[in-house]
């Protein structure tokens, strides 16, 4: 599924989407003439910008947490219809903003819809908690490749499995290990994570109460 919006591309047009490291432009993933950035990313939130446009929040492999504007996404017949939903993975291209962290989405190709993840409230709740945890420990627009991979694996699991307390503890433990804050295997990983966060996501309490062991 490919969506193109007001895309100018390089001199000969935008090439098929590739990761930053495989870009036909510069080595850092920019199209040489336009400054277009490219990355694999997971859609983690969308908010209303105007009557016709959305702000899309992403967790990307190469650029960390970023925000893009999807212009005209809410217009009738928009090419974005059905292609901007929570926890989709996509290859995207955007034009970086010069004076803010709100960039302009230029091209989008969905690579994984994760339709099974939307099949239950608990799966969505658990996925949302995982996202909140990562947002609490990662800097905006800072590469978080290991955290991206952790989230991707967790979402893939939730696509075909209901969450359990064991699964949540596994995610928290993996995150704490990745951050280098979980040295005591006998202690709950959430204890280590609390040291890095000002406050734990409120979603955890609701999630924990509804989960089985």
What do these predicted ranges mean?
Residues 2-4, 31-213:
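Non-catalytic alpha-helical scaffolds and adjoining flexible linkers that form interface surfaces
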């Amino acid at each position: 599924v490919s969506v193109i919006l007001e895309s100018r591309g390089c001199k000969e047009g935008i090439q098929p989407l590739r990761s930053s490291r495989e870009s036909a432009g510069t080595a850092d993933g920019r199209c040489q003439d336009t400054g277009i950035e490219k990355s694999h990313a997971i859609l983690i939130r969308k908010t209303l910008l105007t009557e016709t446009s959305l702000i899309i929040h992403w967790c990307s492999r190469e650029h960390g947490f970023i925000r893009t504007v999807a212009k005209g996404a809410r217009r009738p017949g928009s090419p974005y219809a059905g292609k901007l939903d929570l926890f989709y993975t996509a290859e995207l291209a955007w034009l970086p903003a010069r004076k803010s962290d709100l960039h302009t989405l230029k091209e989008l190709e969905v690579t994984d819809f994760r339709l099974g993840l939307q099949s239950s409230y608990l799966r969505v709740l658990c996925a949302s908690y995982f996202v909140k945890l990562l947002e609490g420990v990662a800097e905006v627009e800072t590469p978080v490749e290991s955290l991206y991979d952790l989230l991707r694996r967790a979402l893939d699991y939730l696509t075909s499995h209901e969450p359990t307390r064991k699964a949540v503890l596994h995610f928290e433990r993996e995150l704490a290990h990745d951050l280098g804050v979980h040295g005591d295997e006998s202690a709950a990983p959430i204890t280590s994570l609390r040291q890095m966060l000002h406050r734990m996501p409120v979603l955890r309490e609701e999630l924990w109460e509804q989960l089985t062991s």
